[in-house]
Amino acid sequence: MTAAALAEIAAFFGLLTAAAVPLGAYAARVLSTAPPHGRGPVARLERGLYRLAGVDPAEQMGWRRYAAAALTFNAAGLLAVFALERLQAALPGNPAGLPAVSPLVAWNTAVSFATNTNWQAYGGESTMSHLTQMGALTVQNFLSAATGISVLAALVRALAGPAGSGLGSFWVDLTRVTLRLLLPLAAALALLLAWQGVPQTSSAAARWPTLSATAASPGAEQVVALGPVASQVAVKQLGTNGGGYFNANSAHPYENPTPLSNLLEALSILLVPAALCFAFGALVKDRRQGWTVYSAMLAILVPLTVATVSAEQRGNPALAALGVDASPSALQPGGNMEGKEARLGPVDSAIWAAATTAASNGSVNAAHDSFTALGGLWPLWLMQLGEVVFGGVGSGLYGMLLFAILAVFLAGLMVGRTPEYLGKKVEAYEVKMASLAILAPSATVLLGTAAACLLPAGYGAVGNPGPHGFTELLYALSSTANNNGSAFGGLAASTPFWTLLTGVAMLVGRYWVMLPVLAIAGAFARKRPVPAGPGTLPTHGPLFAGLLVATVLLVGALTFLPALALGPVIEHLQAVPR
């Protein structure tokens, strides 16, 4: 691994921290429970929306009502996306004349975008009309992200509030996060991307003569798909959505044309999840809590990013055994260039891969299926940790707080004391709910992979033999059950078996985590804060950060090490010359 690669990794995380701290302070103000004041256009729009919808901005919901509102809203969004997909052939905004999306793919896509997964069993530019891309998918990118942040806000209020406090109003949280946080960020990023060359147009396609035109075929031309790309790419990155306008996602030069656009998009993957760590510290009135969680996330992500970059820069061991020179030099980037854009190279591709799988983003600027065995292992494991290393906007942090609850419970067992977190006692109910939320996605991954290995409809969709084929199955279930959305491209994901299986996995991974989190929030909201005593475990500082990291890694290792040994580990050992 070169010094330049290490410097790039250090600069990337330095820029992330510098941007996340002030954004976190702003996000904390957005998530405060005070009614909207002021005469600005956003405040007036917010109050108008509340009046139109009959929402009381001062309402304090219990956890069941908050959950019912979130589920109802998400179900309505799912049905709206499905309807637009099925009717797009008869609707305007379809200059390419694309037909209706097939029922199973439409259902899978609607579930995918409602759950913030953005798993794509279709090619964007060849399947979805402009209206569907804008009115269904881009809108859901905002709303699914806002849902995750709203649930996080409810949990944090329960931890920070007095006994008997409510969780706030889901409708108010959803509106504020969308209008005051996601829309301004996405608008700014979309303008920057358009400046860099990302299209934002209502035109269907451009036609260009090809370089291979001959006297026999002088009219040979290439049809280049266009559309409202910049607006969708901006929110797909900031909202940890990940679904690309084009089938090649951010490897496509119209989604990611320049080194600057690549940096902006990669930083945007982690920006909001990182900022929410600092918002958490501000909301609980102890900034050390936010820094502790953020440090724990970095302590996992940075080494795994280095490991991914190192694996890709070393190249394929099977080719090295044949004498292929894959060393970085002044004339070549070196490493494993299969499946990568020549303008980006293995380092930028590997940094993106680590970031997109740490967050539940899933966008790609390279083909993950073409990574080396070890280069694909670390992004796969980052997803299997539960998408809590930054994770999705809102969902990543509330997932990490579940591990924090589990960590203080384990520490309490070791010293024989009732555990506490932020002054609220952690009892059997909270531990059961946290365990359910942590285990549900993992069980879905393992059971789904087992079913795919046993049924011809499952393993028949695999495009590669041996351990790599098994890794394709494992990656697909790990991605969908943890709401990531990236994929190993060798899997035929649009078959009926896989559209149904991944759709169910996405629903379980989203709502079987969200509902226990809200149940925990309801339990904490009823509890009186307990003053810290001499035996209270401090939940800030290096000691607790280390305990939190150990808990996350222990659960991830015990759950998935056998499966990983059957896939990428064996694949790597097979490639190493004997």
Swiss-Prot record:
Membrane topology note: Multi-pass membrane protein
Keyword Cell membrane appears in the UniProt entry: yes
Compartments, as annotated in UniProt: Cell inner membrane
Coiled-coil features, chain-numbered ranges: none
Name of a matching Pfam family: KdpA
GO molecular function terms listed in the Swiss-Prot or TrEMBL record: P-type potassium transmembrane transporter activity; potassium ion binding
Record bears the keyword Cell membrane: yes
Keywords: Cell inner membrane, Cell membrane, Ion transport, Membrane, Potassium, Potassium transport, Transmembrane, Transmembrane helix, Transport
Transmembrane residue ranges: 3-23, 67-87, 95-115, 136-156, 181-201, 264-284, 291-311, 396-416, 436-456, 504-524, 543-563
Cellular-component GO terms for this entry: plasma membrane
Similarity comment: family membership: Belongs to the KdpA family.
PANTHER family given in the database record: POTASSIUM-TRANSPORTING ATPASE A CHAIN, POTASSIUM-TRANSPORTING ATPASE POTASSIUM-BINDING SUBUNIT
Annotated function: Part of the high-affinity ATP-driven potassium transport (or Kdp) system, which catalyzes the hydrolysis of ATP coupled with the electrogenic transport of potassium into the cytoplasm. This subunit binds the periplasmic potassium ions and delivers the ions to the membrane domain of KdpB through an intramembrane tunnel.
Quaternary assembly: The system is composed of three essential subunits: KdpA, KdpB and KdpC.
Protein name: Potassium-transporting ATPase potassium-binding subunit
Gene: kdpA
